Each structure stands twice: as structure tokens, then as C-alpha cells.
Amino acid sequence: MSRNASKIAGPCLAIASAALGADFPEEQLLWPNGIENNPIVYEESNIMREEAFNPQAPSGSCRVYSHVAEPTFFIYRPTPEKNTGVSLVVLPGGGYRDIWLDKEGHDIGLYYQELGITSLVVKYRTNSQVEGKERMSLETYLPNAIADAAEGIRILRRQAKDLNIDPKKIGLGGFSAGGHLAIALCLADLGDDAQPAFSFLIYPWIQEGLDFEILKSRPFPPSFIVVGQPDKLTPVDGCLLFYGELCENKVPAELHVYGKGDHGFSLAHGTGHSTEKWPSTFIDWLRDMEMIESGPGKG
């Protein structure tokens, strides 16, 4: 059984709700043939609520989903004249309980679409709380989310010709728990078709469930990392530790620690702080990594 639940959090959200979906691409099943023996099942699934949002956010909304058992995805495509051939698999955060689909998914796709980058936003399976039951352990849950993220990469590779993207320039990244998921996938051994060319990790959660010893024996993609110094949910210490591990293992990496920007700043549009420069700095980094050459996508 599936039910959508909506909780309005302020008058501006009611206005935004009327326009929801106007510029969003089609939502598609990540696993159209179903997931065999899917361990993630909810009596009430795909529950949605709305949260306050940044008026300058590209999506103009902030929907948050929980109890996701049937993962889906959305593809954002740039116009042909802007297309750089670079693509991203975007993993929104939400502590694995939720998916902040607009703030850390659609907003990213909409923004980078204008800069010539294709984005596939994944609404992956969640480890949401069910009354009277304990949540799965991270060890039990994580392989399911990793499988969803990996399928996002494989979809882009399979559709590379139709999407006019370079299969060797597919990046993977995410926000908060989505950043943790991206790192976990990059550390996993799922075959070349599921490995990204680079990663982007925005205030990633790095507190547990990651074995950095693997970096000594397995390649890790070049990484772009962003975090705010005031962040208490995903503290700077975790990013510093991870960055140090990457450097020690000679993985090309760039870390940006901003003096302002608490957890969940997303694109940081309209903050007036240096934090809002990270999305364009990411484009510069892609040029440094020779993923983007010049011209289209220039920020």
C-alpha cells in the first residue's frame, strides 16, 4: 500500500506547492523489473512532507520523502549547445531516514543543467523509522542504497549515446548521508561499470561505516569536498580525516572549508557568504581535472 502524506510548513510552501513539477523531468523507476527479495518494505511508503525552502532555490520547493522502498530517478539534460558531455549522479541527503529530494537533488540538477552538465538524481531506498520496530543496522541497510546508487551510474553508461554524454566523465556525489553513500560506493568493488570518474562530496557524513584501509589497495576517484566550519552534524574533522587519507594514498582531491555555512546549505544561494561560490568552484575543479575543456559550462 502506498500513501503520500504532506505537512505544510509555512504560507510560502502553499504557493510553491501549486507549481510543483512544472520544471521537473519524468520520475522513472530505477529497477523497472522490480527488486528481487527487497528487504526494504513499508506498509505506508513514499511519504512526503514539505519543509521551508530558500526562495532563491531553483526548484522553488522543498519536498522531503521517507519510507522509500521503490527507488526512482530523474534525468536533467542541458541544451545541445551547452552540453559538456559531463554527467553527475546526485544523491540527496537525509540521514538515510529521508530524501531531501528538492533541496539536494532537483536544485542541483536544475543548476548544473544550465552549465551544460547532465544530472541523474536518485531517490534511493531509505532506512526510515517504523513505529514499534528498530531501524536496520547501517551494515544491513547500506548495501541496498549502494546498489541503487550504482544502478544510477550504470543507467547513464547504458544511455550515454542517447544522452550525448561521455561514459568516461560520469561523476558521483551527494550531500550529507548522500555523500557517505557516494564514498561507500567508491570504496566498494562493484565492477568498472559502477565506478565514477570523480566524486563530489558536500558536507558528507563520515562518522562510521567506511573502511579507509581499502584506499591502500583499490583506486578511488578524484574528489571535490565541501563543508562549513559551523557544521555540527557532519563536523569538519571527518572531512579533514578523509582528505588526509586521500592525500596519503595519492588520490587527487580538493577540500573547501567555509567559515560560514551550517549543515544543509545546499547551493547556498542568496546567503551572501563565500559558501555560495562552491557550485562554480566545482566547475573550475572539473576543468582542472580535464573533465570540462572550455566554453560551454563556464561559470
Tell me what each language-model feature is.
Residues P39-Y65, A69-F74, T79-T84, L88, ...:
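Serine-hydrolase catalytic machinery in alpha/beta-hydrolase-like enzymes
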Residues L91-G95, S176, P204, G228-Q229:
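Glycine-rich His-Gly loop
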Residues A197-N249, E254:
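The feature captures the conserved acid-bearing segment of alpha/beta-hydrolase catalytic domains
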Residues N249-G299:
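C-terminal catalytic histidine-bearing segment of alpha/beta-hydrolase fold enzymes
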Residues M1-K7:
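Positively charged n-region of N-terminal signal peptides that target proteins for export
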